[in-house]
């Protein structure tokens, strides 16, 4: 993922300095989509491991999240 981000930043800098060709613009779009897909996957993995407890120690994780976690781990 770091290489994708570096390439995105390189293209952004080049765009500011001299502009991008249509091929580079298409590459930038693809790289951004790949980066966002990776971020979303990481977020979902993190969320699937979350359990929410109230101050008394009871599990108050929303049912919808519990259902999604069940699907994820099955």
From Swiss-Prot:
SUPFAM superfamilies: YnzC-like. Residues 61-74 have a biased composition (Basic and acidic residues). Residues 53-74 are annotated as: Disordered. Keywords: Cytoplasm. It is found in: Cytoplasm. The keyword Cytoplasm applies. Its main location: cytoplasm. It holds the Pfam family DUF896. It comes from the Bacteria. InterPro entries: DUF896. One of its GO terms (cellular component) is cytoplasm. Belongs to the UPF0291 family. This is UPF0291 protein EF_0064.
């Amino acid at each position: 993922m770091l290489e994708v981000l570096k390439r995105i930043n390189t293209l952004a800098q080049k765009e500011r300095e001299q502009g991008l060709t249509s091929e580079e613009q298409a590459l930038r779009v693809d790289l951004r989509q790949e980066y966002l897909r990776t971020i979303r996957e990481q977020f979902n993995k993190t969320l699937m491991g979350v359990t929410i407890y109230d101050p008394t120690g009871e599990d108050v994780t929303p049912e919808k999240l519990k259902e999604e976690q069940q699907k994820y781990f099955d």
